[in-house]
Amino acid sequence: MRLRIGLDIDDTVCDFINPYLKRFGTPHKDSEITRNVNRILIKDREFWLNLPVINRPNFMPALYCTKRVHSKAWSKKFLELNDLPVAPIYQIYCQISSKAPRIKGRVDVFIDDSISNFIDLNLHGVPCLLMDAKHNRKWGPVGRIFSLREEEIEDCYNLFLDTLYPNFKDLVYDKFG
């Protein structure tokens, strides 16, 4: 049985952070990124359509789920322009909202670069693997993937389910608690 795999877009499929930093410089707080996205980038179609692809899936994702605030049509156009698999896009407009209610039952596993999304999804019953990125390396190696190769995802998913996932809540509360 093939896994139903869901994907985040920014910093999982495409590079968001480097084009952002090139344009705005290093933020002093994460809230600066949110403010610049909500006030400036929300209107900049070319920025979103021209983000470079950093990880290309070798499978058809079940869905994409993103916290992008612009028109969903721009995300679809980005996928088409970059010859990426087109799948349903679930968009969460609030950065602090959980992706879990939108995707639970629709995927077997979700791939995200955000530690907060990774923790939230796993705590809410959606197995999530962490796409390796410079900004998330404080999380350990278990549950981390380095490509969007289906075989790597399946291997990591099976290991994750057999080891960390059953005790995820206890481990997270011990670490961040």
Region annotations inferred by a language model:
Residues 14-16, 22, 71-75, 99-101, ...:
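Short catalytic/ligand-binding loop motif for oxyanion handling, primarily in non-cytosolic enzymes
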Residues 8, 63-67, 111, 131:
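Short hydrophobic segments within beta-strands
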Residues 89-95, 143-159:
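Short acidic-hydrophobic, aromatic-tinged amphipathic segments that line or gate anion-handling sites
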Residues 1-7, 170-177:
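Non-catalytic pre-domain segments flanking phosphatase-related domains
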Residues 54-82, 92-93:
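Substrate-recognition element of Asp-dependent hydrolases with the DxDx(T/V) motif
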Residues 109-149:
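Acidic, Mg2+-coordinating phosphoryl-transfer loop and its flanking beta/alpha structural elements
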Residues 1-45:
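Active-site neighborhood of HAD-like aspartate-dependent phosphohydrolases
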Residues 85-107:
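Donor nucleotide-activated moiety binding/catalytic core segment of transferases
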